[in-house]
A protein has these predicted regions:
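Terminal domain-initiation and capping elements
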Residues: 1-120
Length: 120
């Protein structure tokens, strides 16, 4: 097994804890499904959130999905003028036999415009 990295992001419609849980949960589910992963394949997940998101930690959504024995961390995204608002990004380190080129990076909704080069 090799260590691979999976990127992903989702733009929230509003800064509410329940909405964040729903949207981050959908992002994590899509990352797992599109890459044929189980939670045992996860090594760690880094989350960032734009400074306008303050209602909850994105990692809380992962815990509610049952990802309880994987190291998670949250950080604030750089506050760049003109950047897309209300975005949660993730970088998941995984164990996989897939070649790096076959890893599916998941950008949901409007966040797909962030990385047109790798979004699937």
């Amino acid at each position: 097994m090799a260590v691979r990295a999976v990127r992903g992001a989702v733009q929230l419609e509003r800064d509410e804890a329940g909405h964040m849980e729903e949207q981050v949960g959908a992002l994590l589910t899509a990352v797992l499904e599109r890459n044929g992963l189980h939670t045992d394949d996860l090594i760690s997940i880094w989350f960032t959130a734009t400074p306008d998101l303050r209602s909850d930690f994105p990692a809380a959504a992962a815990r509610k999905l049952g990802i309880v024995d994987v190291p998670l961390i949250c950080a604030q995204e750089l506050d760049v003028e003109g950047a897309m608002p209300r975005v949660v990004r993730l970088l998941a380190h995984i164990e996989s036999d897939k070649p790096r080129a076959d890893v599916a990076h998941v950008y949901l909704g409007a966040a797909a415009t962030l990385r047109k080069d790798i979004a699937q």
